[in-house]
Curated annotation (Swiss-Prot):
This protein's UniProt keywords: Host nucleus, Secreted, Signal, Virulence
Localization of this protein: Secreted; Host nucleus
Keyword Transferase attributed: no
Region (LQLFLAK domain) location: 18-57
Principal location: secreted
Source organism of this protein record: Phytophthora infestans (Potato late blight agent)
Residue span of motif HVLVXXP motif: 109-115
Superkingdom of origin organism: Eukaryota
Role this protein plays: Secreted effector that elicits necrosis in host plants, a characteristic of plant innate immunity.
Name this polypeptide is given: Crinkler effector protein 5
Length: 349
């Protein structure tokens, strides 16, 4: 069991503790918070799923539980400076309350935002998108609602799967401008290790481009892992991640989501080399993630290993770059591997 101290944003004198098994999820923590506060009018009529939780930590420092806490809770707290805790995350996640994380003393671990609570403007800013992005969501929702093949969850909320939305529809709302994704230099020794492993995979699996589509993922993953390993444990790769929007009436599915702090890189494998559908999937999913986590800048990659499309979904625009993994006799060149890896490294830096 782990004991966590929580505070409600906007409410003075609100710190309280909850005990929950570290093997549980953030969703379970929401239920424990509600159960601990059945007599509290602030939480009495709120469904646990509607609570928004933020890790009360900046760098290695927890929020101090001292005489200044009440004043801080009622000030204009910018929750975007804290990590938004997604419901599906395990509490044992290294970036949350994993075994190597010190919980400290006289600190607050979780900030709770209650829907409908009168909060200072900055505390609610994460929930109100930029005007340009809000307009994009409204236009996107018209398409999603029109093409709706509803998936209904236990709360009776429905969303539209990305597979029911065409690229041409999404492109009308999220037309991408050209940009050049920068590169950040990776040491030759690291590239050599990655390249040697890819050569080993080529010997084991045979043809990449003309071979079976399913095996391409085995070539994509080492590139991602190599780059993520450069950050000394600061980066996590979430596999087969699915998200469902609240204000965006769609859902997204990614082969991987790479996380580093507030940065997100969403990875989509282009199925049957259909890059347009892959881009539609990535763009809808990115907006859903922006909706859920209050993010303003998201990266996505759509690839079949040979072709790579890099995109940025910003508040006021969408940008896209593309690059080719050059091949010689169906074997990637070292320079091409270096180019792709360094673009991804720059995204996460």
């Amino acid at each position: 069991m782990v004991k966590l101290f929580c505070s409600i944003v906007g409410v003075a004198g609100s710190p309280f503790s909850v005990e929950v098994n570290e093997g549980k999820t953030v969703d379970d923590l929401k239920k424990a918070i509600k159960a601990e506060n059945l007599d509290d009018p602030t939480l009495r009529n709120v469904a646990p799923k509607n609570l928004q939780l933020f890790l009360a930590k900046k760098g290695d420092a927890w929020l101090r539980y001292n005489e200044d806490l009440d004043t801080y809770l009622q000030s204009e707290i910018d929750t975007s400076s804290y990590l938004h805790m997604r419901a599906s995350w395990k509490l044992s996640k290294p970036t949350l309350f994993g075994p190597d994380v010190s919980l400290g003393e006289d600190v607050v671990h979780v900030l709770v935002v209650v829907p409908g609570q009168r909060l200072p403007i900055a505390a609610t800013a994460i929930h109100e998108p930029h005007p340009a992005r809000k307009k994009r969501w409204e236009e996107l929702n018209k398409i999603l609602d029109r093409n709706q093949r509803a998936k209904v969850n236990a709360a009776g909320e429905s969303s539209t799967g990305y597979s029911y939305v065409s690229f041409s529809d999404v492109d009308r709302v999220m037309r991408a401008r050209r940009y050049e994704q920068p590169r950040k230099v990776i040491e030759n020794e690291k590239i050599d290790v990655l390249y040697e492993y890819l050569l080993l995979l080529t010997k084991a699996f045979g043809e990449i481009v003309n071979g079976k589509e399913a095996k391409r993922l085995y070539f994509i993953v080492p590139v991602l892992v190599c780059v993520c390993g450069l950050f000394d444990g600061e980066v996590r790769i979430l596999a087969e991640e699915t998200v469902t929007g609240k204000r965006v009436h769609g859902d997204g599915a990614f082969e991987f989501v790479i996380e580093r702090g507030s940065k997100r890189v969403c990875i989509v494998k282009a199925k049957r080399d259909d890059f347009q559908q892959g881009l539609a999937q990535a763009y809808v999913g990115s907006e859903v993630l922006a909706d859920l986590e209050g993010l303003t800048d998201l990266f996505s990659i759509v690839t079949n290993f040979k072709e790579w499309y890099f995109s940025r979904c910003l508040n006021d625009r969408v940008e896209r770059d593309d690059a080719t993994m050059d091949m010689e006799h169906d074997i990637p060149t070292r320079e091409a591997v270096k180019k792709i890896a360094e673009k991804i490294y720059s995204m996460l830096s």
